[in-house]
A protein has these predicted regions:
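Carbohydrate transferase catalytic cores enriched for Leloir-type hexosyltransferases
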Residues: 1-175
Length: 175
């Protein structure tokens, strides 16, 4: 099976970057059957050195939450002819229609108010609208959703009316 992983957060020392790094590191140790294509930015491309010959680096120099991510990245993914893609964050391109799973860490952005932002009012609401559009797209189109806690799973079900069976809780581990 040809599996892609969105590792554009790789090389960040905390949060999703650490989750990305540890997931790939541990997958390399346990899976010698599937072929993995690790999509990295230019900044993180040299930081990741595959330790398993079934893992391959792919340059995907599209900034998070950008036009390129939404409208150019999907075409790079289509050219890779993947059987499954794992987005490690909710920012799934709107134009991506192949089979994928998505990890949802939390729904914090959903609850932010203008008071939590220094953005101009119009820009704040435009950004929030895009967030709602992108996360709803990811949740509705995903074959499976990985939630990092039971609380996150309950919130996804509550706000997006998703069948509980579509969501798998996989807790993040401590090292």
């Amino acid at each position: 099976m040809r599996i892609g992983i969105d590792a554009r957060f790789y090389d960040l020392s905390a949060g999703i970057g650490r989750y990305t790094e540890k997931l790939i590191t541990h997958l390399e140790k346990v899976d010698n059957v599937n072929d993995y294509f690790i999509f990295l930015t230019k900044e993180s491309f040299n930081s990741y050195q595959p330790q398993n010959p079934k893992f391959h680096k792919v340059l995907a120099n599209y900034c998070w939450y950008s036009f390129g991510e939404q409208f150019l990245f999907p075409f790079k993914l289509y050219r890779a002819k993947l059987d499954l893609f794992h987005f490690l964050h909710f920012n799934v391109p709107l134009l991506f229609f192949n089979k994928f799973i998505v990890t949802i860490h939390d729904l914090t952005q959903r609850k932010l108010t203008k008071r939590a932002s220094k953005l101009p009012l119009l820009f704040f609401y435009f950004k929030k609208l895009l967030y709602f559009l992108v996360i709803k797209n990811a949740i509705k189109k995903a074959k499976k959703i990985i939630a990092i806690s039971s609380f996150t799973k309950k919130e996804i079900i509550k706000y997006y009316k998703i069948e509980p069976e579509k969501i798998i809780v996989i807790y993040e581990s401590a090292e």
